[in-house]
Each structure stands twice: as C-alpha cells, then as structure tokens.
UniProtKB/Swiss-Prot annotation:
Gene3D superfamilies associated with the record: P-loop containing nucleotide triphosphate hydrolases
Protein name in the entry: Arabinose import ATP-binding protein AraG
The entry's keywords: ATP-binding, Cell inner membrane, Cell membrane, Membrane, Nucleotide-binding, Repeat, Sugar transport, Translocase, Transport
GO cellular component assignments: plasma membrane
Species of provenance: Shigella sonnei (strain Ss046)
Protein's job: Part of the ABC transporter complex AraFGH involved in arabinose import. Responsible for energy coupling to the transport system.
PROSITE patterns tied to this protein: ABC_TRANSPORTER_1, ABC_TRANSPORTER_2, ARAG
Annotated membrane topology: Peripheral membrane protein
Length: 504
C-alpha cells in the first residue's frame, strides 16, 4: 500500500540550457520501499532530471524535496552526503584500484596518513556480503566482469548510506544471469525501504520491477501510473509517443520487383547448416531466432566480417565474391551491425565524418583532397531527411542517443549506391519513438527498391515490420511465415530448440 508521505519529491523542476529548454515544470512523488520507473523517448528529460538529483546540474526553476526537506546540491559530493546515488550506464570506477578502494574511494579509513587496509577490506567485505557477492575485496577491479563492477558501484552507494538509488539503463551490457542478480539486489534494496529510481527502454524490465511508472515527453511530465495491474504495454507506448501501438510499426502491403539478393547454400562461422534464401527488390525479410540461432553470424559472413566457408551469394543474379567488407560495399550490400558502438560508429569523430566515411573516397578532389563542400552538403542532407537530433554536424557522434547514432549509420549507407541492406538488431536499446523513425526509414528504402534483410530478437518487431519472416534455430532455417499469416505462437514454436530424442 502506498505511503501517505513521499520520501522524494520533484516540485516544478525546470532546466534551461543556452537555446534549449530541457525540462519544464516536472512534479511528481516517489515513496520509500518502491521501485519508481522513469520512461520516455531519448531526449524526454529523464537523464537531465537524474543529473539534477545527483548534483551534476542545478535546476533553473523548482526544487528537490527529500524526507520533507528542500535540498540544493552544489555538486555530486553534496548529493552523496544527502544519501543520493546514481548508478550510470557508464560506471564511474577505477580499474587499477582494488574492489575495496573503489567502494570507499574518498573515505578510506586511515590513521596518521596510512590507509588501514585490514579495516578497509573488512568494511568492504560487509558491503559485498550485504549484496550476496562472493568477491575478495582486495581484488583489482580490472579482473571483474561488468556485472560485478555494477555490484561494486551499488556497494559504493550503500557505503555512503544512500537512501535514494537511481539506475540509468543498468542492464545494457549485462548477461542474462547478471540481469537476474541485479534484479534480486534491487528487490532487496526495495525491502530495506530505499527509494529506487529505474530508467530503462526495456518494457519487460519495467513491468518486472516497478511499483510506479512516470512518463516524460519532450521535457514535460505526462503521467504517473501507480496501479500496475491496470497498465499495459500499449498504454505506456501511447503515453510516451502520443500514438497507439498499432501506429508504431506502420506496415502496409507493397509490390516487389525482381530477385535482388540470393543465398545459395551459404555457410559461415556459427551457421551450422547451409542457408538458402532470396530477397526481392523492395521486400523486407525478417530473420528471427533465439540467442544462438545464428542470425548475427550469417549477417557478418554476408558483409565480409567473417569468411563465408561454403555456398554462393548473388546480387541481381550476379555471383559476388565477398572476402572483406569493402567487397560487399562495392557490390551494393551494406550492414548496420548489432553492436553499433563497437562496430558501427567511430565514437571520437563527428556526425559528419561518420556519415561521409564510406562514400568520401568517391568525392575527393584531385584524387587526394577531401571535398569539404560535398561532405557538408551530404551530411546536412541526411541529418535533415533522417531527423538526426544533433546540435550540428560537427558534434561528436558518441554524444548522440542510440537512435540518432543508428540513423547516422543509415545516412552513411544512403550516401552509397545501395542495393541490399543488412540490419542486425537495428532498434536494440533505442526508445520507442526512435524505433518508429527507423521503421519509416526501412519502409522508404524498400520503396526505393532496396532489398532489406533484418535480424531481430524482438518478435513483435519482426512480425510488425517484415513482409516475410524467416525463422532460424541453432544455425539453420526452421521455417518461413508471411506477414499476413504470422503470429507469435507460430514463430516461437519454430524457433524453440528441438528436444533430443535421446533424452529420457
């Protein structure tokens, strides 16, 4: 039952940056012993609010009230001292230090200028035990997994007696087992009476953990859902984007041209049996399968990231020899990879450079001088047409949201003569509004005659976007479904591993 007095309240919070109004009149309450989710599209204001709560930013208007007391934090240390801790997606730890040193960084127990390592390790051990973690406090942090790093970050918050702990996209780099462990810890923290704020784009996580959900849109408060029995996926999407869920995918029947891409008994590392399929001009074919099905491995082989070990790839009925990505690009086949940060973008380069990097070679002056005029025009054109939200073309792409990074990668390939596009998990870790924009780009490419082959583990997405669904299971094609006939039961039935007849 909800308490009558909130432990944390936001009262009329506004935040303005030069030329940008990031937050306007944000007001809502959070209660002790609850997980309160914050949802909204990228740019909705969630991260800005957390930075105000943590002392990174001062609000332009309004106030933060904690346990009935109006607070004003000059910096993050002041917020920590008031019991506020933020667990960011990019963890703020020191790899070369020990686990214990990271937990008590800034408050190491010492006497006469010498750190009391025995006491340090003992106290750190208590915090780790509290979280159910069997880790030697004297272990250098660099030897731990990302999931263990996160537990150290939480232990660091508990060591400062944090009563308010906010998690910002905490599962983005975790394995399934690490996610389960994180959820166990969050539920324990809730039982202890702490306020938990949880930011995620993943609906299944929100429904698994939350006692309340507050939705933001364009820097404004939309609604707080407090009865979790009465809220569903569709209601959340509508609150976030102002559209019904049926409008998100926007699929419509279309006509197709001649066969554009054909795989004839193709094998690649991670693909167990030869794969044969075809995609016509203007057709969108979705590859669906569970983890380990071989979708990404097939995509990498087709683009030359790994070597095709058998079979033949054809584009417009012509055999293509693909031994490296440049061969695929020259043939008109492009890839948006699954891990866009590691394999798609060049993080420390500008949006302009990331869009132009592939087609640049075709527009150099005199064979060696970069054509700045063409590059500026090309980047600006794709920023406008793809609605890439950036202060300008010279902004570092690492500072953009995942959805805008993905659109920049699409802009890169739109600068080429594209016949086939391979999309591997194109909307992973992207908010629902940006997903809608990505789908529209996919439809536009199909309308231009591009053959689209996209792999996704998001079954509703595959069913909602693809004209035809090819289901993979353990490195082989298990079946094929047409858009008008496909449903989740059929697709999952095909995707599930076969039970061995040898098992009793």
């Amino acid at each position: 039952m909800q308490q009558s007095t909130p432990y944390l309240s936001f009262r009329g919070i506004g935040k303005t940056f030069p030329g940008v109004k990031a937050l306007t009149d944000i007001s809502f309450d959070c209660y002790a012993g609850q997980v309160h989710a914050l949802m909204g599209e990228n740019g909705a204001g969630k991260s800005t609010l957390l930075k105000i709560l943590s002392g990174n930013y001062a609000p332009t208007t309004g106030s933060v009230v904690i346990n009935g007391q109006e607070m004003s934090f000059s910096d993050t240390t002041a917020a920590l001292n008031a019991g506020v801790a933020i667990i960011y997606q990019e963890l703020h730890l020191v790899p070369e230090m020990t686990v214990a040193e990271n937990i008590y960084l800034g408050q190491l127990p010492h006497k006469g200028g010498i750190v009391n390592r025995s006491l340090l390790n003992y106290e750190a051990g208590l915090q780790l035990k509290h979280l159910g973690m069997d880790i030697d406090p004297d272990t250098p942090l660099k030897y731990l997994s990302i999931g263990q790093w996160q537990m150290v970050e939480i232990a660091k918050a508990l060591a400062r007696n944090a009563k308010i702990i906010a998690f910002d996209e905490p599962t983005s780099s975790l394995s399934a087992r690490e996610i389960d462990n994180l959820f166990r810890v969050i539920r324990e923290l809730r039982k202890e009476g702490r306020v938990i704020l949880y930011v995620s784009h993943r609906m299944e996580e929100i429904f698994a953990l939350s006692d309340a959900i507050t939705v933001f849109k364009d820097g404004r408060y939309v609604k707080t859902f407090t009865d979790m029995q009465q809220v569903d996926h569709d209601a959340l999407v509508q609150a976030m984007v102002g559209r019904d869920i049926g409008d998100i995918y926007g699929w419509q029947p279309r006509s197709y041209g001649e066969e554009r891409l054909r795989l004839d008994a193709v094998k690649a590392p991670g693909v167990r049996t030869p794969i044969s399929l075809a995609v016509r001009s203007g057709e969108i074919v979705g590859l669906f399968g569970l983890v380990g099905a071989g979708r990404s491995e097939l995509m990498k082989g087709l683009f030359g990231g790994t070597q095709i070990t058998a079979g033949q790839v054809y584009i417009d009925q012509q055999p293509i020899d693909i031994r490296k990505p440049s061969h695929a690009i020259a043939a008109g086949m492009m890839l948006c990879p699954e891990d866009r940060k590691a394999e798609g973008i060049i993080p420390v380069h500008s949006v302009r450079d990331n869009i132009n990097i592939s087609a640049r070679r075709k527009h150099v002056l005199g064979g060696c001088v970069i054509n700045n005029g063409w590059e500026e025009n090309n980047a600006d054109q794709h920023i406008r047409s793809l609605n890439i939200k950036t202060p300008g073309a010279e902004q570092l792409i690492m500072n953009l949201s995942g959805g805008n990074q993905q659109k920049a990668i699409l802009g890169r390939w739109l600068s080429e003569e594209m016949k086939v596009i391979l999309l591997d998990e194109p909307t992973r870790s992207i908010d629902v509004g940006a997903k809608h924009e990505i789908y529209n780009v996919i439809y536009a490419l199909a309308a231009q005659g591009v053959a689209v082959l996209f792999a996704s583990s998001d079954l509703p997405e595959v069913l909602g976007v693809a004209d035809r669904i090819v289901v993979m299971r353990e490195g082989e094609i298990a079946g094929e479904l047409l858009h008008e006939q496909a449903d989740e039961r059929q697709a999952l039935s095909l995707a599930m591993p076969k039970v061995s007849q040898a098992v009793a």
